[in-house]
Structure formats: structure tokens, C-alpha cells
Regions:
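The feature marks non-catalytic terminal segments
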Residues: 2-12, 185-313
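Active-site beta-strand->loop->alpha-helix modules in alpha/beta enzyme cores, enriched
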Residues: 2-195
């Protein structure tokens, strides 16, 4: 009897939970704020980061109706195993599967200052300098000029890892610190001006949430709405807006949302988890060792992303 009850419960969960996820993903796609008509750069450390960690974001932001132009800047060739030339090509193929307009929109840096290493932390100033050269080459002239000259950049939005790096990889974490340094440099000596680039970072979650697949959507939505509620309560009691970065109603100085949540579909189609997996299995074939099969099946980052606007950079 007990075994029958358990079996019935499992069967019901196998139907109800995916259905709830599909509904929740559709709500996220239609009701949560997103970015439109922006020049966006995804900053990653290694070829395959875009597929393993940011696929839901790329699939959402490259939808034709958003009007965004998304590019990828990868700071290493991933040459730790001597496959840098292969992985460079794999990244471009993955980028096209994930919706980028052209292979040339995925650029790979090959520089000894940014070696693929699980033990190496990249220099913050060197990361920031590279970003300045790529997106704000006039930065040194701006700093030398009168403060009345507004800061400028060739991108509107920069996406990268947060301080936890998702997997605590030092190369990932280095991007976070370098990106923040770059954002700060844009407005250094320019009081009163809004930063021309909004920085969003991918939220790192704990082990249990990381490997619960699409089920983490419920914790993610709860976290986002709880943050919004806390912010509204703070506003009501103090008369001022709160500082909770998870507040979905919080906006940047340019009016961009304070939180970006994206989710892939479970069924087929362009914005599905199957497409995210294909970016690994069809593009990054050199990286498909045994444990990555577990990642692309169980990781919540294949199904959903939560990126927060960085304040006070």
C-alpha cells in the first residue's frame, strides 16, 4: 500500500512539477523586465562559459524582437590542455546556436596575462585596461579632459560572473573585479554623470540549488519577489527606497531593470534547455567529458539565470 502511494506521488510530481516550471518560465518571459535595443557584451573567461552558465540569458537577449546586439568577449582560449585553437572555433559555433548574429560577434583574447588556470587570479587592472581598450578607448583622454565631458562607451550593458564566480574559479572571479574596476573608471572624475554602462552579474547559488535543475526556478522567483517586498516595506517605513539589489523594480540610472531573470523552456524550440545543451554537445565537443554530462542535465544554469545590477561600482 505504502509503495503504491509513493509511486502515485512520484508520478504526480513528474507531471505537476514540469508543468509548473513551464508556466513559470512563460510568466518570466512575458512579465519580467528585460533589456531592449541595447549593445550588450557578455564577458567570460573560457570558451564554454557562455553555454555552461549563461545560455538562458543569451537565448533571451538575442530574441529578434528585443532589438539587442549581443557580443561575447572571452579572455582566454582555454588552452590549459593544449586545445586553444579548437576551443576558439567551438565558441563561435556555440555563439551562433545561442542566437548571436555573426561568428565575429564572439571574440577570443589570446594573451599570456590571461592564462586558463584553476589556480591563477588575473590582475584586476589588466582586465579593466583591456575592457577600456575594447569599449572606451577614449577613457584616458576623458580623464584628462574637463569633468564637463560626459563619459562614453561603445556598449550599454556588460554581463559577467559575480564575486563567487558560480564555481569559485579564480578566472571567473577575476572578471568580476576587473569589470567593476572598468565601470568605476568610466565615471572617475565625472561627478553628476550616470555611468554609460550597466554591469550585471550572474548570481552564485549553493550546491543544492546549483544541481536541482529546473526546480530551482521556484526558489529564484521567491528570492526575487521577497527582495521586492522587502524593498517596498523599507520604502513605506522610511520614505526612501531600499538598497536590496534583488528588487525587480529597482532600476539603473539609465532605466534598465535591477534584476534580470531568464528561463529556458523544457520542450523544443529556440529558447529551450535542449538548445542550451546543444551548445555544449554539438559545439563544445572537446569539453564533453563524463562529468559535464551531469552538469548539462542537472545544473540550474542550463535552465535559468538570475543577473543582478551592480550598484556602487
Amino acid at each position: 500500500m505504502a509503495a503504491t502511494t509513493w509511486a502515485a506521488g512520484i508520478a504526480a510530481a513528474a507531471v505537476v512539477l514540469p508543468s509548473l516550471y513551464v508556466y513559470t518560465a512563460s510568466v518570466i518571459a512575458t512579465r519580467f523586465p528585460t533589456l531592449r535595443n541595447k549593445r550588450i557584451c557578455l564577458l567570460i573567461a573560457h570558451p564554454d562559459d557562455e553555454a555552461m552558465f549563461f545560455a538562458p540569458t543569451l537565448l533571451a537577449l538575442t530574441r529578434p524582437d528585443t532589438g539587442n546586439h549581443v557580443k561575447i568577449l572571452c579572455l582566454s582560449t582555454g588552452d590549459q590542455d593544449g586545445l586553444g585553437h579548437v576551443r576558439r572555433t567551438e565558441l563561435k559555433k556555440s555563439a551562433m546556436l545561442l542566437g548571436l548574429r555573426d561568428e565575429d560577434d564572439a571574440f577570443v583574447v589570446d594573451d599570456p596575462d590571461f592564462r586558463d588556470s584553476i589556480t591563477e587570479t588575473w590582475d584586476t587592472d589588466k582586465v579593466a585596461t583591456l575592457l577600456s581598450a575594447a569599449f572606451a578607448p577614449q577613457l584616458s583622454r576623458q580623464q584628462a579632459a574637463a569633468s564637463a565631458q560626459p563619459p562614453m562607451a561603445s556598449i550599454d550593458v556588460l554581463l559577467t560572473f559575480d564575486a563567487g564566480g558560480v564555481s569559485a574559479h579564480p578566472n571567473h572571479i577575476s572578471l568580476y573585479h576587473g569589470a567593476r574596476r572598468f565601470i568605476s573608471a568610466l565615471t572617475a572624475g565625472k561627478p553628476g554623470y550616470a555611468c554609460p554602462v550597466d554591469l550585471y552579474t550572474l548570481t552564485t547559488v549553493g550546491f543544492a540549488r546549483k544541481y536541482c535543475g529546473f526546480l530551482d526556478v521556484f526558489a529564484t522567483i521567491f528570492s526575487a519577489t521577497l527582495g521586492a517586498g522587502a524593498n517596498m516595506a523599507a520604502s513605506a517605513t522610511s520614505g526612501f527606497g531600499g538598497n536590496n539589489k534583488r528588487d525587480i523594480k529597482n532600476k539603473s540610472d539609465k532605466g534598465n531593470p535591477g534584476l534580470l531573470v531568464t528561463a529556458t523552456g523544457l520542450l523544443g524550440g529556440r529558447e529551450s534547455a535542449a538548445t542550451a545543451r546543444q551548445a555544449m554537445t554539438q559545439a563544445h565537443k572537446s569539453q564533453m567529458v563524463w562529468f559535464r554530462w551531469g552538469w548539462i542535465t542537472m545544473s540550474r544554469y542550463m535552465y535559468l539565470n538570475e543577473l543582478r545590477l551592480e550598484k556602487g561600482s
